[in-house]
Structures are given as structure tokens and as C-alpha cells.
């Protein structure tokens, strides 16, 4: 049997013509009518088969003519272009052939390939008082606080500062011994840590890899970027325990104490600890009229957060204390 004959047998026109031929004229006998009469169920089955074959013909034509989509993630949440998978591509063609998705290239559905995936923005409103890390849920914050419960076992005998790891203590002892094993290849200046030497080389190369997402200003060190972002947010995490004045940098708080409260011991708390009485379980709550935030809009108004600032990585909050410790270390070296 030839291919042309097979296509004619299973075409929509041939099926519908068979249905028309099966109809019985009124002049035929009852026996002939019963013999050749097609019931409604049989008629509907013929029509369903005709519709199915019509759909298959459309799919075959679309598969031969339409180009496959590029590997683009149209939902923005999957790590691969799932429409390139055969099962999803067939489902998309079937929906287009049935008229569920229009074939007009100017329509929003057809232009789905040109959409740019938008990464989801995760807001972390819960703030740790001790290390300034941010978390999205209270449960994550409570789990993190267990880190601060454990005692620090390694203590520096010269200054009394304690550490959780012996490696951190060994690095700290280099400050007291003034051992600087890492020299700069450009100017010869030596540093205690290799990371400090690498940051220093940015001065010679002019490289500024850390860029502010709000104003576009670039910095050579991440600590400078973290301090800079506080100007946009108005966030002042360091507070004087004597007068309550808050500062964006730890070094500014220390200078304030030396000039305004020279007789008091060096015991300052963070701004989050001042507002701990206003928040449940000691979680940081921005200062408002009643001590709590009524809405997300009030949260944005308190911190003066522009929309672009929400895209800043939460990891920057994890580096805040490390950056301020670097400033404190530099100040100690300059004083000594």
C-alpha cells in the first residue's frame, strides 16, 4: 500500500466522507436502515477520531516548521531550560495547536522566549544582636544563636581576647609579635595575613571589584562597601552605652567615647541591644512609636531602603563585624 493511499485513508476528509456515506435515506427498508445505521455513539467516535487526526496533522506540521526554543528558563526558578525536554516541548506544541496558546508572535505567550528571568529576592528581617547576621525566619535565627552560646576556648594571654578556633588565635598572635610573613610584590610592605596583602594590592592595580548596587560606586575592599551601604540604609549598629548615640562604624564609636566619655570603661553595646527590651526574645526591632513595625512599608520608611537595596546580597551582613574588626585592628596598630 502506497504512502499516499495511507494518508488518504486516515485523513480528516476521508473520515468525514465515510460518516456521510453511512447515513441512510428515508426510502430504504428498516432492515437496511438497521444494518447500515450509525448510532450517535459511533458518530461521535468518528468525529473524535477526525479531530484527533487533525490535531496530529497540526502537530506534525508545527514540528517540521517551528524552531525549537532556546534553552531559556521562562519561570525564573528552574536551573535549566525545561522546554527543551521532549515531553514539555510536545505539550507546548499541543497547547498551541489546540488554540490554548496563540500562535501570534506578537502575543505575550509567544514572546515568552524573550523574557529575562528575574531572580527571587529574599528579605531577611531577623537580626542577630551579637554578630549582625540576617535571617529570613525566627527558627533560623534561634538555630544560629546556639553558636554564641558555646564558650570560646582559646584565649590570648597578652590581651585576653578569646577565640573559638586555635587557628584564629594563631593568626591573632601575629599582631602582638609583629610577624608579617606576607610581603606586597609591588612595594614590599608586609602583612600579617595573606588576605590583607591581597586587599592591599588593589591599591597598586586600581582594581575595585566591590560595587554598590544603589549608586554604582566601586571599592577595592568589601569592608568599605559595607560601610558605604549604611549611608543608603541609615543603619547605625553601634551605640554608646553611656549616652545612647549610635554610629555606623565601630571606630567612630570608639573615638566618640575617647572624646566625650574618657572616664568610663570601654564597654559599649550595639544599637540592637538598646532596643532589645522592645522586641520579643531579644530580636532586633527598629525604633518606632510602639516598639514594633506594623507593616513592611513602615519597615522601609524606618531604614529608608530604596527598592534597589533589597537586591544586595545577605552575605554582606555576615561580613559587617569582620569589616569593623579590621578597622579596630588598624586603629590599635596606629595608636601603639
Curated annotation (Swiss-Prot):
Please state where this protein is localized: Nucleus; Cell projection, Axon; Perikaryon
Tagged with keyword Glycosyltransferase: no
Per the record, GO CC terms? axon; nucleus; perikaryon
Zinc-finger (C2H2-type) residue ranges come to 126-148, 154-176, 182-204, 210-232, 238-260
Q: Which UniProt keywords apply?
A: Cell projection, Metal-binding, Nucleus, Repeat, Transcription, Transcription regulation, Zinc, Zinc-finger
Q: Which InterPro entries match?
A: Zinc_finger (IPR050331), Znf_C2H2_sf (IPR036236), Znf_C2H2_type (IPR013087)
Organ and tissue specificity: Expressed in the BDU neurons, the touch neurons, the VA, VB and VC motor neurons, two AVF interneurons and unidentified neurons of the retrovesicular ganglion (at protein level).
Q: State how changing residue 228 to Y affects the protein, per the record.
A: In ls20; misexpression of touch neuron genes in the BDU neurons
Q: Which SUPFAM superfamilies match?
A: beta-beta-alpha zinc fingers
The GO terms describing molecular function are: DNA-binding transcription factor activity; DNA-binding transcription repressor activity, RNA polymerase II-specific; RNA polymerase II cis-regulatory region sequence-specific DNA binding; transcription corepressor activity; transcription corepressor binding; zinc ion binding
Q: Where is this region: Disordered?
A: 253-290
What the entry lists under PROSITE patterns is as follows:
ZINC_FINGER_C2H2_1, ZINC_FINGER_C2H2_2
Single Gene Ontology BP annotation = regulation of transcription by RNA polymerase II
Q: Which domain of life is it from?
A: Eukaryota
How it assembles, according to the record, is: May interact with transcription factor unc-3.
- PANTHER family found in the cross-reference section: GROWTH FACTOR-INDEPENDENT 1B TRANSCRIPTION REPRESSOR (PTHR16515:SF54), PR DOMAIN ZINC FINGER PROTEIN (PTHR16515)
Q: Which function does this protein serve?
A: Transcription factor. Plays a role in the determination of neuroblast cell fate and neuronal differentiation. Negatively modulates expression of several components of dense-core vesicles (DCVs), thereby, in a DCV membrane protein ida-1-dependent manner, regulating neurosecretion. Negatively modulates the transcription of its own gene, the mechanosensory gene mec-3, and also other touch neuron-specific genes in the BDU neurons; required for coordinated movement.
- The protein here is known as Zinc finger protein GFI1 homolog pag-3
Organism expressing this protein natively: Caenorhabditis elegans
Q: Which gene encodes it?
A: pag-3
Amino acid at each position: 500500500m502506497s504512502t499516499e493511499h495511507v494518508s488518504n485513508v486516515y485523513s480528516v476528509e476521508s473520515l468525514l466522507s465515510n460518516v456521510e456515506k453511512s447515513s441512510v435515506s428515508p426510502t430504504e427498508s428498516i432492515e437496511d436502515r438497521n444494518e447500515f445505521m450509525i448510532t450517535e455513539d459511533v458518530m461521535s467516535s468518528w468525529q473524535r477520531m477526525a479531530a484527533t487526526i487533525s490535531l496530529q496533522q497540526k502537530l506534525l506540521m508545527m514540528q517540521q516548521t517551528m524552531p525549537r526554543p532556546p534553552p531559556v528558563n521562562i519561570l525564573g526558578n528552574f536551573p535549566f531550560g525545561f522546554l527543551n525536554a521532549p515531553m514539555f516541548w510536545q505539550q507546548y506544541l499541543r497547547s498551541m495547536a489546540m488554540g490554548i496558546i496563540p500562535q501570534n508572535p506578537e502575543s505575550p505567550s509567544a514572546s515568552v522566549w524573550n523574557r529575562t528571568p528575574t531572580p527571587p529576592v529574599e528579605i531577611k528581617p531577623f537580626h542577630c544582636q551579637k554578630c549582625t547576621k540576617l535571617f529570613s525566619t525566627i527558627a533560623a535565627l534561634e538555630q544560629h544563636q546556639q553558636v554564641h552560646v558555646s564558650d570560646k576556648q582559646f584565649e590570648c594571654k597578652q590581651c585576653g581576647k578569646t577565640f573559638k578556633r586555635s587557628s584564629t588565635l594563631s593568626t591573632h598572635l601575629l599582631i602582638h609579635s609583629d610577624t608579617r610573613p606576607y610581603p606586597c610584590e609591588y612595594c614590599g610592605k608586609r602583612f600579617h595575613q595573606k588576605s590583607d596583602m591581597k586587599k592591599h594590592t588593589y591599591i597598586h592595580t586600581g582594581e575595585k571589584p566591590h560595587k554598590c548596587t544603589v549608586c554604582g560606586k566601586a571599592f577595592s575592599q568589601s569592608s568599605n562597601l559595607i560601610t558605604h551601604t549604611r549611608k543608603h540604609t541609615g543603619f547605625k549598629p553601634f551605640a554608646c552605652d553611656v549616652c545612647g548615640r549610635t554610629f555606623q562604624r565601630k571606630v567612630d564609636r570608639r573615638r566618640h567615647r575617647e572624646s566625650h566619655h574618657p572616664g568610663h570603661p570601654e564597654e559599649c553595646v550595639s544599637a540592637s541591644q538598646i532596643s532589645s527590651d522592645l522586641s520579643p526574645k531579644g530580636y532586633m526591632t527598629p525604633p518606632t512609636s510602639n516598639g514594633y513595625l506594623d507593616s513592611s512599608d513602615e519597615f522601609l520608611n524606618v531604614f529608608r531602603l530604596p527598592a534597589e537595596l533589597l537586591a544586595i546580597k545577605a552575605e554582606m551582613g555576615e561580613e559587617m563585624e569582620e569589616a569593623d574588626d579590621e578597622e579596630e585592628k588598624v586603629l590599635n596598630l596606629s595608636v601603639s
